[in-house]
Amino acid sequence: MANFQLTQEQIADYGRDGYIIVRNFLTQGEIDKLYKIAVGDDSISKHAFDLNDQTGKKTRLTLWYNPGNDAYGLLTRSKRIVDSVDRLLDGSSPVCHFHSKLMQKEPRVGGAWEWHQDYGYWYKNEFLFPDEMISVMVAITEANRANGCLQVIKGTHKMGRVEHGFSGEQVGASQHYVDLALKTMPLVYVELAPGDALFFHSNLLHRSEANLSEKARWSLISCYNRQDNIGYNEPNGSHKVPVKIVPDEALMEWETSGVMDSSGFLEKDKDQALK
């Protein structure tokens, strides 16, 4: 989407609901390029790891901290994303890229994600200001109810941080407060076409069910932070490094390949939020 800029209505919707959906945020050509890399890149597969849900089903993901000049790095550094994030976050210090993860829910075996807030994880990293943190999900393939699309509880970002504990290998929100939220606020299934984007607050309660369909669900989730919001228990310094913004056209016009080995991939046993 060339020269994209959020409207005042979208910014207000984010403040009220804790999320916004932007349809056709990426072109079909951009999605085709990203999908080809996702399924064929050695670095992505080599650094992938599984997290078990409560039933033992596995969700596979690859997470990295440092966006480079590869296709995924150029997307996360693109003007359309970073400028949008800058307008949605509280504060005024520079926007930094915390990390990106490629979510890989394979047909029939891709596991669920339990109800949680992203800040439920990041609180353990000792970030202090959840209003200065945001996630941006881009659908690489279609996301629908059948293949375990994201579910959100609208407006729950205003509840503040909910207590979290372990649910399988994941960090899950207190079921009591989830039940209270579901009695009070609407549940929304976030069904996305390839190229659609979801911007959501770090305290928005969300989950996804297992993929029991015949089709894979792939998505990129990039997380951003204001430079002045220090993660005192976060060993990687990416969250304090301002994003070097590139033009939106870079994804298609610059010579790119798969995710670079210098991207700083996470090793599962070193994730502070899982301890």
Where is each model-derived feature located?
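Short, conserved beta-strand element in jelly-roll/cupin
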Residues: 123-145, 191-192, 223-226
